[in-house]
Amino acid sequence: LKKRNFVLGLIALSVGMGSSLIGGTSAHAAEVTRTYSASKGFSSIEQGTNQWHYEKLAGSAYLDLIYDKSGNRWAAPSGYPWVSATALHPDQNFDAVRKWIAPGKGVISISGSVQKGSPEGDGVVVSIRKDEVKLWSETLTNTKAVTPSGVSRVAVEAGTEISFVVNKRGSSNHDHTMWEPDIAYTGAAGSTAGAAPSKSSASAANKNSSVVSVLDYGAKADDTIDDYPAFVAAIDAAKSMDKPVYVPAGNYVLSDILTIDGVKVQGAGKFLTTLTSTNPKRGSIDLKGTGTELSNLKHVYQTTVARGNGANEKNSITVRGAQNFKIENVYVSKSSTAGIMITYGSKNGIVSGNTLESTGADGIHMTGGSSYITVENNVVRKAGDDTIAVVSYIDSDKAAAHHIVIRKNDVGYGSKARGIAVVGGTDITISNNAIQETSMAGVYIAVEASYNTRNVDRVTVSNNVIDHTGLAKPSNHPNVLVYASQGIVDNVVFNQNTIKNGAHRGIGVWGSGSIKNITFNKNILIHRIGEATTFAKGNIKLNQNEGF
């Protein structure tokens, strides 16, 4: 019996060893060979199906696209960039990316040609990347098909990412690019479900955070490398997650116009976080959409160019038709044109607590029919033109700027034109401001033929201190000037202002246009040089003023 049990034990051991050997053979047999076709494996259901992902890329940040049923492609909400079964198209800020993720350890060979879909445009830059290593790249300027080289027998591990990237060359117009690669894979079977997320996708950033940090999208402070792509990616991700963008302390480099659309961007403080624009002709931070905010940071141009045509692309900040926007606690240092330009019908905005200096044009300029804007508690020094201005043009503005409040600002200090100016506009309130040391009038209310501006109506100027303005010769502006060379200025009221130390004269009302009702109530005029008042035009109403 004992002998029989011993024999059975040997048999069992033999069977166990055999199973082990069979298992080893089975593992070796699990190696597979499979071809992954970009076009045949294209999915309209889920990212990662058949190992394929559809993304956009800015800098080092990959972001998932969303499937667009109408176009039968994966696309950004704006429509670009996009990736279809057979083609890709980038946009100005993002590359278009088709990505394959290796299911296991093995070797791949990539085949299939790439070509522009149109002879128009300035071309595209196409590349193949293994994780962050570029395997191949080519610039395509015509529709000739090109076959990538050096992409055979490439070793991969489970999770290795192979990215097919289409980047604009200069402009993204006509950048439709035909590219449907095949990947022949030999290796471990791994997972065929393929729904695992792209490990390099910025969606892997900490979603539990209440903010989106630009650092999570590749930005690095205090170096000379361009952070623009990382900022674009962070803003895009923040909008999709409905979170603000946070920019930690340090200096960040921006090579182009940064557009913020419906997102809050906040720094660590206007003396801690700095955004440095390196292109003096395209350095504006543009605010668009609804609820956009910019706060707690400094924006500076590395160099500036001449004001020239005054292009908005050269402003420090441009508000382009935004609604319910805020610009708070921002330090603007240098710009080729305006510091903060609010235009294209922007509405319901607050510009508060900012410091602006050495701008090429106006410090803060409101135009283009913008309305319901409050500008308060700002400091403006050494503006290249007016410190704060409301301007309405007949030729280019659909309506006059209206319902603007300008209060509690401290402005002037060597600014090269007027202090606070209304040159066309209605329902404007100017109150509790300190205005000093400007080349032209401290307060200027006017309609100008030279710029074909609109009429002025219902402007109230109250409780301001206007001190030693109108410095420039031979202009010899008074501290306060109401002027019309065309159109109508009407219903302008000055209440309880202190107007003192005018460089050449105190108050002036004149011009060849129509000036109607101008009222002065309880103002104090302290003046020693030239005429105290020059009322050459209009229906002037005086009530309890001193020094007139």
Regions found by a protein language model. Give the residues of each.
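Acidic Gly/Asp/Thr-rich repetitive segments characteristic of extracellular carbohydrate-active
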Residues: V214-P248
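Extracellular beta-strand-rich solenoid/capping regions of secreted or surface-exposed proteins
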Residues: A102, V232-A237, Y252-Q266, T273-N296, ...
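Solenoid scaffold repeats with emphasis on beta-solenoid/beta-helix
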Residues: I108, V212, V245, Y252, ...
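Gly-Asp-aromatic-enriched flexible segments
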Residues: E31-G190
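Short glycine/acidic-rich loop motifs that flank beta-strands on beta-rich extracellular proteins
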Residues: K243, L254-L258, K270, T274-G283, ...
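Consensus "Asn ladder" position of solenoid repeat domains
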Residues: L297, V330, N354, N378, ...
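Sec-dependent N-terminal signal peptides of Gram-positive bacterial secreted proteins and lipoproteins
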Residues: K2-T25
